[in-house]
């Protein structure tokens, strides 16, 4: 499929997207792969990772650790980097509107041996608003 302005960011093949990837054969001790719901790499200067959770579903420890380390590694490489935890209550069978999902937590990357930190407060902003502010988007 050719990508156009009209279909960028949209699922191109819904049937394929519903397929589940079995990572059970990729276990290393107690370490198993995790997925990343979304990432924006902005002009080699900023990176935004995002993870979507239904309502108040927790982030498994292993996934949290992996995402924090990715954010910190990007920061060490000189990129301003954050991870947004987004919440939604989208009914099963409907597409989740990423831009309108509520950001409830933000992890800000720390470079080198300095770890990052979590901002957990009622931001009252959706993912689009947080990304616009972080990236300085004036679109």
Predicted feature residues:
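Nucleic-acid nuclease catalytic cores
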Residues: 74-103
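Conserved catalytic cores of phosphodiester-cleaving nucleases, focusing on short active-site segments
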Residues: 38-40, 46-55
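Compact, well-ordered interaction domains used in eukaryotic information-processing assemblies
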Residues: 53-57, 69, 73
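Basic, amphipathic alpha-helical patches used to engage nucleic acids or provide basic targeting signals
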Residues: 64, 69-70, 77
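Helix-rich interaction surfaces within compact, conserved domain-sized segments
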Residues: 95-139
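Short beta-strand or tight-loop elements
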Residues: 34-36
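Acidic-basic catalytic patches of nuclease active cores, encompassing PD-(D/E)XK
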Residues: 1-32, 125-139
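Active-site-adjacent loop/helix micro-motif of nuclease/hydrolase catalytic cores
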Residues: 31, 56-66
């Amino acid at each position: 499929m050719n990508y156009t302005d009209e279909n960028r960011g949209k699922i191109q093949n819904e049937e394929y997207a519903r397929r589940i990837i079995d990572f059970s054969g990729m276990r290393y001790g107690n370490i198993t792969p995790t997925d990343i719901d979304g990432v924006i790499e902005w002009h080699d200067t900023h990176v935004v990772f995002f993870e979507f959770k239904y309502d108040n579903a927790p982030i498994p420890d292993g996934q949290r650790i992996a995402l924090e380390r990715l954010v910190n590694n990007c920061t060490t490489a000189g990129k301003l980097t954050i991870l947004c935890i987004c919440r939604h209550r989208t009914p099963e069978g409907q597409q989740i509107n990423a831009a309108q999902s509520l950001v409830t937590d933000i992890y800000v990357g720390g470079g080198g041996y300095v770890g990052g930190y979590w901002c957990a407060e009622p931001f009252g902003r959706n993912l689009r608003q947080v990304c616009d502010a972080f990236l300085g988007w004036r679109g």
